[in-house]
Amino acid sequence: MGAYKYVAEMERRKQSDVLRFLLRVRCWEYRQLNVIHRASRPSRPDKARRLGYKAKQGYVIYRVRVRRGNRKRPAPKGATFGKPVNQGINQLKFQRSLRSTAEERVARRCGGLRILNSYWITKTVSTSTLKSSLSTPSTRLSVVMPVSTGSATPYTSAENLAVSHPLGKQNRGLGRGSKHTKSPNHAFWKRTNKLFLRRYR
């Protein structure tokens, strides 16, 4: 077996003494850093390479920390606009994953880069840390590579989430096979053309 096989096997056993110690040290280290910061190299090189990262010019790695748990609805200065004060505030469930949120924040920070993919590193009680790999579309090297083909113009953060990287496809239900035959177009039309008179926010 090659070295990456051993690394991948070690990452699978998260209850082992080695990995429990490593995750504890990583949690402490990442808490001292900014919420979004650039990493010099991937924490899991085998996983990063599987997801399209290459250790060459034009590819960068960013580490992101995202808060876990429910999404709290903002009610500035307690302005509830005639609705009950405590209803529909705390127990809202965000429809997208933490990974999607992390990728969106990195895309907003690095407007000239394109998201390739991301993977989980560690989590604490209140936060989850993920790593995103990005490529530079304007670099000749990465434009030539088939992994990151496309025009050399930078994306907006919304386009970055909608392009054909795996999470963007998953969120929009794109793909081939029997799971992807039922189009969400009618449901989208119905949702956007219906009048909602909600008692609670």
Curated annotation (Swiss-Prot):
Q: List cellular component terms (GO).
A: cytosolic large ribosomal subunit
**Which one GO biological process term can you cite for this protein?**
cytoplasmic translation
The lineage's top-level taxon is: Eukaryota
Q: Return the Gene3D superfamilies for the record.
A: Ribosomal protein l15e (3.40.1120.10)
- Write the record's keywords in alphabetical order, separated by commas: Ribonucleoprotein, Ribosomal protein
Q: Which Pfam families match?
A: Ribosomal_L15e (PF00827)
Q: Name one GO molecular function term.
A: structural constituent of ribosome
Disulfide pairs?
A: none
Q: Which family does it belong to?
A: Belongs to the eukaryotic ribosomal protein eL15 family.
Question: Which protein are we looking at?
Answer: Large ribosomal subunit protein eL15
Point out the gene that encodes the protein. Answer: RPL15
